A protein has these predicted regions:
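Short hydrophobic alpha-helices and adjacent helix-cap/hinge residues
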Residues: 1-196
Length: 196
């Protein structure tokens, strides 16, 4: 493949962090019976605009009866985000990515956005594990973050001990699955019996 040729030439390895947009939408539809609207929260930093494009196409092709809205930190403050999400009803699913702002100060990082909107009645789903423990997320479809982190640390350790990065095989997680914070799921009014 082209990447492996470049890896040899430039001495790098690659760890893919896949995002499962279609699986997340399917999971949300299962967990929120009668879901009529999907709101995607993300910043303007790549790849969120690309995810927005993919989600628009997915909704148009497979869920034409569903409304879709992308709320971005590029055009909305945290206060505007809160107001937009606070007005949602139980037929709206919210899928969260990252929420960085242009200033990149610590007070503007995603976890603070999670904490700010955690009290909203609508259930928040996520495309990444971030926010599952303390950020208000009920769940999502994702790879196993702990396995990925172990692999990352192993890869770094191998490089620090002299192994050429290009000799380390590319890594792609293959253990993606639905993950839930069951306490939060119940507190947000979702039925745990609907979990896959």
């Amino acid at each position: 493949t082209h990447m492996s040729e470049l890896a040899e030439e430039f001495n790098f390895t690659y760890m893919h962090t896949p995002i499962y947009l279609e699986e997340n939408v399917q999971l949300m539809c299962r967990m929120i019976p009668g879901m009529k609207k999907l709101i995607f929260l993300g910043d303007g930093i790549y790849p969120n605009p690309e995810y927005d494009k993919q989600l628009r196409e997915l909704i148009k092709d497979k869920y034409p009866q569903m409304d879709y809205e992308y709320i971005s930190s590029r055009t909305n403050s945290l206060h505007q985000l809160y107001n937009a999400v606070r007005k949602t009803d139980k037929t709206t699913g919210i899928l969260v990515s990252t929420w960085f702002t242009e200033s990149f100060t610590s007070s503007n990082f995603l976890i603070n956005a999670y904490r700010s909107i955690a009290s909203i009645s609508a259930p928040l789903f996520t495309i990444r594990y971030a926010g599952m423990d303390d950020g208000g997320m009920v769940g999502g479809y994702m790879y196993n973050d702990q396995i990925f982190t172990r692999q990352l640390l192993k890869t770094i350790d191998e490089i620090l001990h002299g192994k050429k990065a290009s000799d380390i095989p590319f890594y792609e997680p293959n253990e993606a699955h639905p993950a839930f914070n069951y306490t939060r799921l119940v507190n947000k009014g979702l039925d745990p019996d609907l979990c896959p």
